[in-house]
């Protein structure tokens, strides 16, 4: 899947306007929930300087608990204190703190305006991680930063972690089991 362009509208309208997915917003607060049928994540710097991986929480039941979402959260939490895990293409990255909570499109726009948004991506079983590069909300365009071409460093790193586990290049906490062939 190519980098995702998300828009807060109907799916058919989004496709007609050149977007790949809809960023679903919930309630009057317009909380970001999912991108299509995928879980949505943002990486942003807090006003205090911390670096967070933020995704909608499960308590309001506005999103599905996707297995890839859970995998992303587990991997980031497990590798938080392992500095060697946070390198992609020779770039050392600052570890992320996972935050599961409601967050609004207005917060996303604020972090962009203040230069605190690092990147955004969607997670799903079919494609693991797809970077989000653009959101249109109420006819205003929100450009999502990407430091690594079409992807952000964190999206590329997490996608690499998942790929390595799926294809047997590394293991993680009992996620995989080798099944021996019998003749």
Roles of regions detected by a PLM:
Residues 1-183:
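Helix-start/capping segments and mature chain N-termini
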